[in-house]
Amino acid sequence: MGFYFMGPVDVPDYPPQRLVRIYVPNRAHASDRPLLILFDGQNVFDDAPSFAGGWRAHERVEKLAKKVSPPVVVGIDHGGGHRIEELSPFPMGRSHGRLDGFLDWIKRWLIPHMQHHFAVTHDPRKIVLGGSSMGGIAALYGLLSLPHVFGGCIAMSPSLWIARARIFQWAESRPAPEHARIYIDAGKREPPTMHTQADAMDKVLYRQGARNLHFFSDPTGTHSEAAWRKRLPRALRFQFGSAKKAAY
């Protein structure tokens, strides 16, 4: 139990090579372990590799272990200058929007690797994708486009505005997975559009059929690692504890 590091890992066609950071909780089950995959792995655990402080996800998981089924946590480092391109589902500016291929690598290589080497579950309902900002929209898109792979998402302060907010039209064109756990949040001290769009997306997904939704409006939340670190326990409780259905 503890930390493991893979890499540098080569994600084909997605330079540069990167670290994959893994934490196995002390209370992890011997088999069928839930899995939480987080984008921007530099920010997931300690402060050292992060530009603005880490989430210390390992500490959050351990503190909640008596209340939730503790997941194995995987942080995938972003590609530096390629980050926007690999996390965007749609073209924007000079970025071609290559998230689909990155998600395919997660589905075809990363998850099977975790299942084989870390006793991670084969039940998609126990596999959650998460992130913040660009990682937030990537996590939401990943769940909606691959509901047979992921059973939940954590989308903190998702950048829904990118590509002229195209994700709204995209989400309205398809059914949302009814039983998937969808956590979305935003802070009142972020740019107003961030909060308004996050709230609006929560309602869109309900209209499209999602029923395990949790939207949290953080009255003091800013667009920062510190705010996401503070909100992470709430997201973990929703994803890996007993979820309550949305009421509208």
What are these model-derived regions, one by one?
Residues 1-248:
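Non-catalytic cap/lid and distal C-terminal segments of serine-dependent acyl enzymes
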